[in-house]
């Protein structure tokens, strides 16, 4: 009898482990993911993506982005690029875009926003991408590219939101978010 109980416990433990392993691999395979082709997470942005101001040598070309496995119920996306190292640690907003249709799963480098998408305001108060331009000689800055899957229709938000205003507007509408970090220095 004791042998049978021990064998049953071992089978139950093995079965539980298999279920857990299946659940973890299923979750990992279905996680909302963001990548930038050619730039691994933690990698360095090419100089073309840098700002054109202050002799940074760039052309303000947005990085290419791809995402997959948005959660069920996603109606639109929002993307921000934020440099937490900029402005002496207070941070710098480089890009705000929202109202991106749920059918969109990528943005080409330097490409036009998808039809209907809106540009928010960057650190300069412009509705545009502003490429990185950290002070010369500083350690490379980190640029957090974050995408939010939203339950909002693409046309739900007004044009010209700042990053803070966008965060306030989507606070109760984020289904999931994911990010990658890129670096740039000069």
Range-by-range predicted roles:
Residues 11-23:
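Bacterial N-terminal signal peptides
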Residues 27-186:
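N-terminus-centered regions that define maturation/targeting leaders and the start
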């Amino acid at each position: 009898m004791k042998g049978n109980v021990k064998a049953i416990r071992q089978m139950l433990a093995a079965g539980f482990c298999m279920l857990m392993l299946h659940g973890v691999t299923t979750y990992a395979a279905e996680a909302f993911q963001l990548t930038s082709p050619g730039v691994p997470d933690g990698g360095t942005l090419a100089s073309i993506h840098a700002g054109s101001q202050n002799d940074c040598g760039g052309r303000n070309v947005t990085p290419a982005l791809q995402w997959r496995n948005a959660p069920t119920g996603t109606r639109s996306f929002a993307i921000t690029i934020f440099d937490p190292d900029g402005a002496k640690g207070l941070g710098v907003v480089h890009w705000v875009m929202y109202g991106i249709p749920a059918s969109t799963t990528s943005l080409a480098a330097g490409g036009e926003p998808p039809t209907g998408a809106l540009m928010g305001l960057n650190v300069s108060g412009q509705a545009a991408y502003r490429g990185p331009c950290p002070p010369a000689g500083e350690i490379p800055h980190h640029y957090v590219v974050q995408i939010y899957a939203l339950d909002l229709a693409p046309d739900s938000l007004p044009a010209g939101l700042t990053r803070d205003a966008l965060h306030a507007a989507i606070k109760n509408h984020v289904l999931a978010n994911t990010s990658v970090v890129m670096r740039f220095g000069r």
